[in-house]
Amino acid sequence: MTAPRRFAGDTLVIASHNRGKVREIADLLAAHVRHFPSAAELDLPEPEETEATFIGNAALKARAAALASGLPALADDSGLWVDALDGAPGIYSARWAGPEKDFGAAMERVRRELEAAADRRGDRARFVCALALAWPDGHVEAVEGTAHGTLTFPPRGGKGFGYDPVFIPDGHACTYAELDPAHKHAISHRADAFRQLLARCFA
C-alpha cells in the first residue's frame, strides 16, 4: 500500500467561491499553512460537478484548481443527507439553493419534502464532508467526515451558512448556526474530515 503524500509548502489554494466555507477551512488549517488564496481570489472557474459522490466532486474541484493555479489545492464537497428523503439533497445540496445560492429557499424545500414524505425515519439527517487535496501533477488524497443529527424548523441562528440553521448535531440542543464557531469547528462533519486529512497529509 502506497503511503499518503504529505503537504509541503506554505501556500494552499482553497478551491471554493463560498466565503463562509473558505473562512472555516482557513481557520481549521491555520496552524499548518500560511497563505490561503481562494479560487474566487485567483479568478479560477467553477468546474461543473459531474461526479456521483461527495469524494468524486471534491477531487474534481481540487484537481481543476491545482492544474489552473500550479499550486496544491484543497476542495470540499459537502452536503446534507436526509434519511427520509433517501439521502437528498445530498450531492445536490448547493444546487437546491439555485444560482442565487438562496439557502433559505433550499431549507424550505427540505421542510416541504420532509412533510410530504411522512417517513418513519422522521427528521434524522447527517452532514457529509469530503475533502480532496490535489497537486498540479494530478495526485489526490481524499477523506470523508460525517456528523449525525436531526432537523428542526423554522431555521434558527445566524452564525453559520448553508443548511446550518436547521441542523441540530447529536448531543446538542442548538443548531449549527446557534453554536459558537469554535465549538462548531470542533464537532462538525468538516472537523471530522479535517482530523483525518491532518493525520494523513499534514502530521
UniProtKB/Swiss-Prot annotation:
Binding-site residues, Mg(2+): E48, D77
GO MF term set: dITP diphosphatase activity; ITP diphosphatase activity; metal ion binding; nucleotide binding; ribonucleoside triphosphate phosphatase activity; XTP diphosphatase activity
GO biological process terms, semicolon-separated: nucleotide metabolic process; purine nucleoside triphosphate catabolic process
Coiled-coil ranges per UniProt: none
A Pfam family of this chain: Ham1p_like
Keyword Metal-binding carried by entry: yes
Keywords annotated in UniProt: Hydrolase, Magnesium, Metal-binding, Nucleotide metabolism, Nucleotide-binding
CDD domains: HAM1
Disulphide bond pairs: none
Keyword match Plastid: no
Function, as annotated: Pyrophosphatase that catalyzes the hydrolysis of nucleoside triphosphates to their monophosphate derivatives, with a high preference for the non-canonical purine nucleotides XTP (xanthosine triphosphate), dITP (deoxyinosine triphosphate) and ITP. Seems to function as a house-cleaning enzyme that removes non-canonical purine nucleotides from the nucleotide pool, thus preventing their incorporation into DNA/RNA and avoiding chromosomal lesions.
Protein name, entry field: dITP/XTP pyrophosphatase
Organism name: Rhodospirillum centenum (strain ATCC 51521 / SW)
